Amino acid sequence: MKVLIFGPSASGKTYLSQALQNLGIHAFDGDDIEGLSAWYNKNGKKIVTPENADEAITNHYSFLWSKKFLTNFLSKFSTVYIFGGSGNITHMFDLFDKIYFLKANPEIQRKRLQSVFRKNPMMDRNEKGLMVWGDWLEEVAQKKGITFLDASQTPEQIFEIISQ
């Protein structure tokens, strides 16, 4: 069974993937899968990671996953859980048996975005303040009838849902 859990920045994807890994489950944060993702300019050319959110937005850069790479990665597991998101996430849906959207309370997201433990805090802010990447994903999930997961649940509670 191949399961995708996607959602906007600071919804808890990294935390959940790590918690499940600690339980011995094949769970991965998409950002930690070497070779899965990269940044691209508007012409589709791979670029170095932007220094901050303003650079990415101003230059119309996109953070995308490689479908070919993901297909190969998923083939290595009979059961696997991928937590993540990208600008082309909907193009990956057909690779998964189940798909969930991780919905977090906006206030909790803001607090998480301000955490000193964020991997790349410069990407979480722009000239207007805090930046939530992928907030458009909720609308996509609603339109596609994807099941929502409450991010305030424990990793064990969420695993109980996604492992069925």
List the predicted regions and their residue ranges:
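Hydrophobic anchor at the beta1->P-loop junction of P-loop NTPases
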Residues: 5
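Small-molecule kinase domains that catalyze NTP-dependent phosphoryl transfer to phosphate-bearing small molecules
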Residues: 89, 118-161
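Conserved substrate/cofactor phosphate-moiety recognition/catalytic segment
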Residues: 18-67
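Walker A/P-loop
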Residues: 14
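ATP-binding Walker
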Residues: 11
